[in-house]
Each structure stands twice: as C-alpha cells, then as structure tokens.
Amino acid sequence: DSVPILLSFMIVAFGAQEKDAGVILSVAALLGTLAGLGTKGCSQRFGFLRTLCLITGAYGVGYAANTFSQNIWFSGFFFVIAMMGYGVFHNAAFSYLTVRTERSMLGKVLGDFTAIGDIGRIPITAFAGFLAAWSFAGIPGWRIVCALFGAVACCITLYLLWTWLRNGDAGGSPCEERKKPQSLLPPLSLLRDRHTASTVVANILDGFSGDQIFAFLPFLLFAKGMDPKVIGSFALAFTVGCFAGKMACGRLVGIFGSRKVFITSKLLMSALLAVLVTAQGLPVIIVTSILLGIVTKGTVPVLQTLLVEPVTDPQAYDDLFAFNTFARGSTNILTPLLFGFIASAFSAEYIYVLMAIVSVFAVAPVLFGRPMRA
C-alpha cells in the first residue's frame, strides 16, 4: 500500500504525469496477477520457506534500488518487482494455512491473518506518507523511506535464508498434502451457475469502483491545492477505516445477510465519493476517508461470503476463490491505466465521479441475482 504514496511523490519530483503512474500500476497489477498464478508451482519446487525468501527478496530489491532512482521509469521497474512478490505472497500464505487448518476453523484463521496484515499496514503506510513529504539533509523523504523498507526486507530475507540453511524447510510445500493434482486455473464452467456469475460480476464492479481509491487520492488532494504533508493523515485515516470495515461488515453479515450489507455499502460508497470530490476542508476529508475505508475494504469479506453461501462442497472453495480473485485482479490491471489517462486529460475529480457511478451499478448483479440456495 505504500507504493502508490511513494510513486505520487516521485511523479512530482521527476516532473512526470499522472498517466505515468497509471501505466506503472497497471503493469504491476498485470505481472503481479501472472506471478500469482505460478504460486503453486513455486511452492512445490522450493518449499514454503524458500518461497518466502524469494518474496521478501523481491521486496528488498524493489525498494532498495529506488533509493537511487533518477527517473520515473526506473522507479516503476523496481516497484513492479516488489509488487510481483506481493502478488505471490497472499496466494502462498492462504494455501499454506488452508492445507494445515481444519475447515471449521479456516474462516477464523484467515480472518486473523488478514487482520494482522491490516495492523501492520496502518502504521507503516502512515509512516511512509508522513516521512515521504519531508526532506532531511537535502535528501527527499521518499528516498529515505525506500532505503528503510529495502533494508528491513533484505534483513528478513537473510534471516529466512539462514533459518532454511539451518533447519531446512520444516513447513514444506503448502500444496504437497493435496492428494490429487489440480489445475492452476479454475474451470470456466463455474460461470454457468447464475449465482456465481452474478457475484463475480459484482466483484469486478466493486474492484473498479473501490480498489484504486487509495492509489489516486494523492493526486486528488494535490488538485485541491493541499499540502503534500496531509497525505500521511489521509493514509492513516483510510487504512484505519479499512481495518474497521473488514471486522464490522463481516459481523453485520451474520445479522442482516450478505446481500443487504453489500448493497448498503456500495450505495454509501457512492455518496462518500461524491462528498470527497466536493469537500475542501481537511477535517471533512479525513472523516470521509475513514468511512470510505470501511465500505471499500469491508465489501471484500462480504463478497467472499456471498460467493460460497450456496456451496456445499468444500472442495469447490479453492476454484471459486481463485476465479473471483483472478477476475478482480484482471480489473485492477486496466483501471490504473484508464484512471491515469483520465487524470492527465481532465482531472483527478473525474476518476472519483466515475467510481461513484460504477459503485451504484455494482448493486445490480447482487440485487437481481438468483436468490441464495439453502
């Protein structure tokens, strides 16, 4: 999550344009999605511990190299390397936890795992935003952030490598315990089920309307003439909202049902995006950012619940989640490129107007989809 923030400061420092950020983020999403497809083979070949070494090594190289960047495309190349590692990490971790967790406990384990990730992102992302806006001894803050993040990732890589050399890959491959080989890609026949198809379409529209809110908001704030130092305040507010949203919306599903929670969240998101575009005062933007974080990331567990509610075969979960994730990831390949050109040709405000409109349309597949089966 720190990449879009750092990239926005690099755009300003190098005199580049918003569309350059869109190209970089689109390429990163494309290669990250493709890298994620190779997670299973990577884990089987190298084992879980060595796979983590490769992932953290990609983080370290990507950030450390950008400490010395002199142009936006150099920065983009090495950020793509870091984000490819990010694309592999969650698939490898989820696979590892799924294989080694009882089905009845899987939801709790994965929920705790994602919550821990959010706890880490909140202070780290805010730290990156605050520090990147300053300079120290003539060194831009974003270079210092890249150096710190790169050093930490490289140290973790060396520790994991030392652990593997000393103990071997005690965790083994996260996929080695499966009895039958499975295809890397889920079958397209999943879309024959109307409920599955409507949920996947809703997921695509949800991703279009919400996944790039964080990435392009620095440009929106710049367009409003705000001090770059407020980016850190926004980052903190938005990530706190994301953490709260995952927990709050997940619990509301048990009370009101996943359909009602999703529809309400998307309509609220549309209204909040309209407020964000028109707001001028920092307090209003901060409050709106928190609420946007809640309804943006809160819809992710809601859609996952909606997707599997009518499914009785636990073996189908892997294919359903993989297809849903791939569909959303494919959307994220295109949206940064589209939004970057919109921001350059018109202004960042038009991006958020488009997001608000699509957020309303995301309700339709869920509203008119087949009623949930028992």
Describe the function of each predicted region:
Residues 80-117:
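Cytoplasmic helix-loop-helix junction between adjacent transmembrane helices
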Residues 1, 29-37, 122, 239-243, ...:
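Residue-level signature of mid-helix packing/kink "hotspots" within the transmembrane helices
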Residues 50-64, 260-274:
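Structural signature of the two symmetry-related core transmembrane helices
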Residues 167-199:
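Juxtamembrane intracellular "pre-TM" segments in multi-pass secondary transporters
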Residues 1-22, 29, 198, 202, ...:
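Helix-loop boundary and gating motifs at the non-cytosolic
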Residues 88-101, 298-312:
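Intracellular juxtamembrane helix-capping segments at the cytosolic ends
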Residues 113-164:
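Helix-loop-helix hairpin linking two adjacent transmembrane segments in secondary transporters
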Residues 35-47, 245-257, 343:
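Helix-to-loop junctions at the C-terminal end of transmembrane segments
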